[in-house]
């Protein structure tokens, strides 16, 4: 099994991970927001409530044991550049995805706003895994397994969390 090197960093309590794609920004946006696209690498989603600010979605994480369904609130959506989401439930968290295009390359910046830096040890490897699934989906490559990311990347993120 090949171990994936961690790429994320911490900026205060924000976990930041980037990926680059040789594709137009609109194409990458579609991979992130179209239910048929997300169903192939992250999981399907559907609108629950589109009545105004804080529109709600339900999503299924197909890579997680038991394929759990959860809900989240869309806090901001500036197509095709920025998406901010807050998950619902007792373990709620917020994250943002920003896309920037330069020439024929689109850079995705993922930011998870952590309540506590120490949580990076658990969240970092998971987001590395999911963002690599997106890369592999877009490039037609076989998906990797979560155990290639966790626990091998956990110490990297714990070390980052220990640096103030």
Locations of the language-model features?
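A detector for short, charged/polar N-terminal pre-domain segments
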Residues: 2-8
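Short, surface-exposed charged micro-motifs
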Residues: 7, 73, 94-98
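Short beta-edge strand/loop motif at the mouth of beta-sheet-based domains
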Residues: 9-10, 14-17, 35-76, 80-82, ...
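A short beta-loop-alpha structural element at the N-terminal edge
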Residues: 19-25
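A generic beta-sheet turn/junction motif
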Residues: 21, 63-65, 78, 89-90, ...
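Beta-strand/loop substructures that line and gate deep hydrophobic ligand-binding cavities in soluble
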Residues: 84-138
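Short, highly charged C-terminal tails/helix-capping segments
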Residues: 136-164
